[in-house]
Regions:
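Membrane-embedded alpha-helical bundles of multi-pass transporters/translocases
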Residues: 2-538
Length: 538
């Protein structure tokens, strides 16, 4: 790196320094994301140990599904609309950014207060509407839990505003770290309180943890001082109007995206007890994998894409999307193959203890396998949607997102009777795949040269490498071993998983796949593939 700096001009040196900084951020953010998902998934371990796939586990997934729908509604509205506008306001004046933050924060607080009141006073009607298949006893527990979770909705919803603001200020680590601490607090709190309070312990720890996370993120935002001031800065008002203009087209699409998950739970509530939990455990595991890799990468890339689009550097914009696309494909294809091939050992090692029985493992692993088929789709969806957002185009992904939600619901209803919970999972994967095909085609038209013929040799190399991985995985899975948890971990999971990945890495090296070099750079030097993505440091 020192030799490279000597050989480059001052302008290139600055570029290298920016790339190195982004690389360190990606690595650190991925590390925190890993810890966050470990702590977050430890919550599922605790629930699995105490409740397995019983009625109480169904209540847990149904209740958190409703709560998180409200919280993520705020995030999905705020992140693509507030982030680029707040970033612009920082270059104007401190009063403009402060006024914008105040208006966004208080507006979200008003919405969340109404949502919390609805949970308190109309929860009974809500559960009858959203969970019609629940028995009276399950519905009563769900109602009580949702009412107790209303403060958590308010606090955690507001953290979506502070999280977005910190990302707009490029304080990625300060945005992510409090969330990791929150997840750890929830896990420790559940372990301590579940034996005493039962499932209602969830409301206590989420409420207290949400308040702590909000206060921590507010501390790192200089504009938090504006919350107690009445500032009539006209620029701040105009910026807030721009946020609302960007948010407007998102509202219907985001609501429909939340409806999709709620309808899945609605349909699953009419199936035999435990099948809603099968979907819940498996979907959360896929989400954890996505957040550790693709989402962490795209979170940083999105900020850079927004700046490139604002500066009208469309050639670099297209190049960054193209190279990120290739990297995501390279990461997700082998991981998807491993998840599909090792679905039962993964679920058994992670969950099968306490109240989580062998039957629970069998059902959850089947749902997990279906979701694993969609890992590539889910990874690319994050990139494509955020690419449109960086271009300040929220209408296109929202429009096709709505159409795909209708497709998801239609397929889920059609497949429910013949396939049960597997039909719900399959419908979700099919609809998401249709969405990324459409968005990819539109993005390719807007960004000339995005998916040109240069990608064909790469796809051929990747296909050949993947075939070798599948053959090696099949061979290693054929090794017989005694049926115990330790042997399952060693011979059914680690041996075939690591062995197949080593074969994949070796083939990538022999075929000189560039994305393999980027990953080696990440592991050896803690420099993520940013330099490789830009190719400016050569």
């Amino acid at each position: 790196l020192q030799q490279s700096l000597v050989q480059h001009t001052p302008g290139n040196i600055a570029s290298l320094q920016d790339e190195s900084r982004l690389a360190r951020i990606v690595f650190s953010l991925s590390t925190i994301a890993v810890l966050t998902k470990i702590f977050g998934f430890a919550e599922k371990f605790v629930i699995a140990h105490f409740f397995g796939t019983s009625d109480t586990a169904d209540v847990y997934f149904a209740s958190t599904g409703i709560i998180l729908s409200i919280i993520w509604l705020v995030r999905e509205l705020m992140y693509p609309s507030l982030l680029p506008v707040f970033a612009d306001s920082l270059s104007k004046s401190a009063s403009a950014s402060g006024n914008l933050f105040r208006k966004a924060f208080l507006s979200a607080a008003g919405f969340l207060a109404v949502a919390a009141l609805v949970l308190i006073f109309f929860c009974g009607h809500l559960t009858k509407l959203l969970l019609p298949g629940f028995s009276e006893s399950k519905r009563l527990v769900t109602v009580n839990l949702l009412r107790m979770l209303s403060p958590a909705v308010f606090f955690l919803g507001l953290t979506m505003v502070t999280y977005t603001t910190l990302n707009a200020r490029k304080k990625f680590l300060k945005a992510a770290f409090p969330e990791a601490v929150l997840k750890l607090f929830i896990v420790l709190g559940l372990i301590a309180l579940l034996p005493v309070l039962g499932i209602y312990a969830l409301a206590v720890v989420m409420g207290l943890g949400g308040l702590g996370c909000l206060l921590a993120q507010l501390y790192f935002i200089p504009e938090h001082k504006s919350l107690t001031k009445q500032d009539n800065d006209k620029n701040g008002t105009e910026y807030f109007k721009n946020v609302l203009l960007l948010m407007g087209p998102l509202v219907v699409g985001v609501i429909f995206s939340r409806i999709s998950g709620l309808v899945d739970n609605l349909l699953a509530s009419m199936l035999p007890s435990g099948q809603l939990s099968y979907l819940g455990y498996s979907k959360k595991l896929i989400d954890a994998i996505l957040l550790i890799g693709p989402v962490a990468l795209v979170t940083v890339i999105y900020s850079q894409l927004s700046h490139l689009a604002s500066a009208k550097e469309y050639e670099k914009f297209t190049s960054l999307i193209s190279k990120t696309f290739r990297l995501l494909i390279y990461l997700s294809v082998p991981v998807a193959c491993l998840l599909i091939g090792l679905n039962q050992p993964i679920i058994r090692v992670l969950f099968q203890r306490g109240e989580f029985t062998a039957d629970s493992t069998f059902g959850t692993s089947r749902a997990f396998m279906i979701y694993a088929f969609g890992l590539i789709t889910f990874s690319l969806e994050v990139l494509f949607v955020h690419s449109f957002f960086a271009l300040k185009d929220t209408k296109t992904p929202v429009t096709y997102g709505i159409l795909c939600v209708f497709l998801d619901i239609t397929l889920a209803i059609a497949l429910l009777k013949p396939l049960g919970f597997l039909g719900i999972a399959g419908a979700f994967v099919i609809s998401k795949t249709a969405k990324i095909i459409i968005l990819g085609a539109i993005l390719n038209k807007r960004c000339a040269g995005l998916f040109d013929l240069k990608i064909v040799p790469y796809l051929i190399k990747l296909s050949a490498t993947t075939c070798v991985l599948l053959l090696s995985l099949r061979f290693l899975l054929g090794i017989n071993n005694p049926d115990s948890l330790i042997n399952t971990f060693a011979f059914d999971l680690m041996l075939p998983g690591i062995g197949a990945l080593l074969v994949f890495a070796g083939c990538s090296y022999l075929l000189r796949i560039d994305e393999f070099k980027a990953l080696v750079s990440l592991l050896r030097y803690r420099r993520a593939a940013i330099s490789t993505l830009y190719e400016e440091a050569k």
